[in-house]
Amino acid sequence: MALLTPFLPCFMVAMKRSRNIVILTGAGISAESGIDTFRSAGGLWEQHRVEDVATPEAFARDPDLVLRFYDMRREAIQTKEPNPAHLALARLDREWPKRDGGQVLIVTQNVDDLHERGGALNVLHMHGEHLNAWCLACDSRPRWTGTLIDRPPCPVCSEPALRPDIVWFGEVPYRMDEIYEAVAAADLFVSIGTSGAVYPAAGLVRTARELGLQTLELNLERSQGSAWFDETRLGPASEIVPAWVDELLG
């Protein structure tokens, strides 16, 4: 188990006295489970430019390419397993409310289900989920583990109008009002495995600081928003996240 550089005593006390915690997770937490990040691939996803597979315009221009791409990603994600960072956050999610009735909310930018499979219950997907589809005819979002390339009928309305339930570039992330309300009610904001480059998620730490929350960054390397955090600890998520959870619950 990795040992974290000791926190300032006043910050450690403030963390332990927190009641509600909001944790933002990004691609870095799932990378160690074998899910490639867009930025680590030199601006390519499976050799595709983001403009070709992750925008509404791309879907309108070449829906077959987009559907094949997401079918491949959906299949691949189902072969991956949660790593120690996911398991540690699930433990925190279970045990923290027992202390003072507080709550942990995991707000993830990731579209995999590794937090849930790791045992976390309070997870909010702001960028959608690979294992959901979105029907453009009836606006339902059914669970979906198969393929979409053959235009299967929606299980709700029977129309062949399903697309990936993913927030593409240029679209509005999901449940932002809930996220801001949770940050406003929290005492501690933690960012794990994020680049600090994708908004509005990247702006949450600034909101947290302006509201007076304690802020902590756990990342492989410093992010574009590191200056906004009270404390930063660097290292692989699978090592530093369990170490932090051990300290917080200890």
Q: Model-derived features: where do they sit?
A:
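Conserved catalytic core of sirtuin-type NAD+-dependent deacylases
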Residues: 2-250
